[in-house]
Amino acid sequence: MSVAANRKLLLDVFRAIEQRDDRRFRELLRPDFELHWPPSLPYGGSKARTWSETWEPFQLGETERRMDPRVVAVSEDEGVVLWRQRGVSPSGERFEGELLGLYQIRDGKLARAQMFYFDTVAVASFLKKATSG
């Protein structure tokens, strides 16, 4: 696919996630799609919880679901996106952190995604406090 088409694909993926449009999200993925999160997080590695199960309780509003994706680089088969993750705990504590995602694209669909947090410790700390209350 072209660079422009891949840029659009990446932004469409983020739009589907922000809008919680699971059907559209699945349409944008290859059947063998792989997702890789840091193993130190509750949804990383081979842990049972998913990103959605972990974060959706803390992203009830549109503000928290907004990811502000910015395509940093894109080629014919991969892209890098800088995006923000937000959440609010039941006690009102707010979290906002930046990530870089490395995305592989094959046949016009997302094949692989790997996330790199700028501060994994802050994410883990927020989740621990937010779920222990």
Predicted segments, located by residue:
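Short, low-complexity N-terminal intrinsically disordered segments enriched in polar/charged residues
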Residues: 1-31, 129-133
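Hydrophobic/basic alpha-helical segments enriched in Actinobacteria
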Residues: 6, 91, 104-106, 122
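Hydrophobic pocket/interface hotspot
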Residues: 10-13, 24-26, 33, 50-51, ...
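A solvent-exposed, acidic/Ser-Thr-rich amphipathic alpha-helical stretch
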Residues: 23-77
